[in-house]
Amino acid sequence: KTQYGYSVRVDLFNTRQESDRLRTIVDDADFRAARLIVGPVYEEELPAVIGYAEEYAVPVVSPLADVKNVDSDVLFQMAPPQMRKYAKIEELTQGEHKQVILIYGEKNDREFEREILAALQGVPYARHNYRYAVKEGDQGLSSLLANGKDNLLIVLSDSGLEVDRILAAIASANTNLVARGKTPPRFTIVGNSRWNRFGNLDRALYFKDRLVLFSTYHAKRDAEVIKTFDSDYIKAFGALPSLYSYRGYDAAMIFVPAMYSDIQYDMEGRRYTPLQTSYTFQQMPGGSNHVNQNWMRVSYRPDFTITVD
């Protein structure tokens, strides 16, 4: 209301993941007065809502699901599809002096490997096996960095300890090369967003190693826009917001104003960034759903800044 001047009534319904409960909700008078439906969260609950929404031309926003089995022109999907996860890796692999190297550990994330290999189709790459036990450390990784090329290193290890060792070894190799008067290596590391579950990683290495991660959502607590939102949220609810809270805010800021215009067509191809995560909605080839195409590429810089695109 304060930003756009709209006064909106919000009705909340809990489906409890029960089909009978969902049918009751769809028949509810307050539900049928809605001009915008956000949810349900789970894809299997969408068909009951979509049937009503199509009949009365009410937009439906799916905030979290990567929808596979529901197709409708009234449906907007906020979560980017898995198939688009590494769309932004292409420009990292381009260049006359580019060298792409997959770094394997003793235990590797095979799903991540499959995703990367699919994204690298047609791109030449080399493989490097990192083994801490053979004391390869800096020496083995120094040879990767000192090749005079623009290196893209993709770390496939699925061990928190091993990932930390690899990142530390690369940072050490870079420091040693520069200290010996060598040309500063040019390199970027692509990591796995699932590393966030590792509690032992030295996050300072992310910056030293110019790490790039791909994520469905990004909200950095010390960013000014996030700090402002967090402060307002705490005042209102007495607790820190979760990622679901951020997504809910994004949904409101994108779709409530759109509700007052031609939502089906005015939004297509436009870029929306309510907080730090950006959304661009397009209909997928052969489908009717309006799907956010934008995975966030989070880049850690040596000057200890983070860029998001």
Predicted regions and their residues:
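Short beta-strand elements in bilobed, periplasmic/extracellular small-molecule ligand-binding domains
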Residues: 3-16, 72, 102, 121-136
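Beta-alpha junction/loop-to-helix N-cap segments that form part of ligand/metal-binding clefts
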Residues: 6-68
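Periplasmic-binding protein-like
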Residues: 32-42, 61-63, 99-105, 148-167, ...
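Extracellular glycoside hydrolase catalytic/binding regions
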Residues: 61-62, 68-85
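Glycine-rich, charge-decorated loop segments at or immediately adjacent to ligand/cofactor-binding or catalytic sites
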Residues: 71-76, 138-142, 195-208
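Extracellular/periplasmic periplasmic-binding protein-like sensory domains
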Residues: 167-247
